[in-house]
């Protein structure tokens, strides 16, 4: 989520991506889908009714609440002159927030996949190959729903990441040595892929709201698995490396991660509004990249404050019944 806020800050404040978009944005987006799939797995088994209830409260309901509440301010910030009926149509067709809409569709598709396969790993392996083929077709625009309601194109592209996260959790039995070896192997494999993608001449395709470079499936899979291994590798005493972070930093990352849905709804609007305020005051980007970092920190603090207030005073908007600031 920090990477998404950083990307939106950079675009709003400087007018462009100074750090190449293709180098990290698609990866962190797919990492979110990977984490979603990871959280799907339960040792006691998959319950469709329970998961659909969680999906309705935790994803779909917040989508309608926040996109409805932010529709007019968002239109005003972007200078749009749409009518209320246009705004309503935008929300109902899933265009109010492309990422949350695609997450909702991808999770629903994955629910149906787990239900139909009875979560049997052999069926899931076969379905995974089919999902990869579909993702490649949609990710290269060989296949596409032209209307792209509820950003189904992006959802299909993300489906393998959910399955990868689910399988990673289900078969999470690797010891430290195996994790270190696999991490080193994936790191070596990722280096040439990232060098290729970093080239300005490397082709990419616009799929709905996301730009995907060629080899996106390979790059995304390598990146999310590297992140996963980095956060799960343990020392000899069983303490994970990530647990060696300063407590305040670990607490901040954990707190932010658990509230990512609300963070995302404000990750674009607040950077846009803050940039507009700075512009009115005569402060614009002057070529010093340190300014971007300062503005990013301000955006993160403001979004965190808003998110805290929502979880503290309006928890029902996030699917929770009790305050959880």
What are these regions (language model features)?
Residues 1-325:
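Alpha-helical transmembrane segments and their immediate juxtamembrane cytosolic regions
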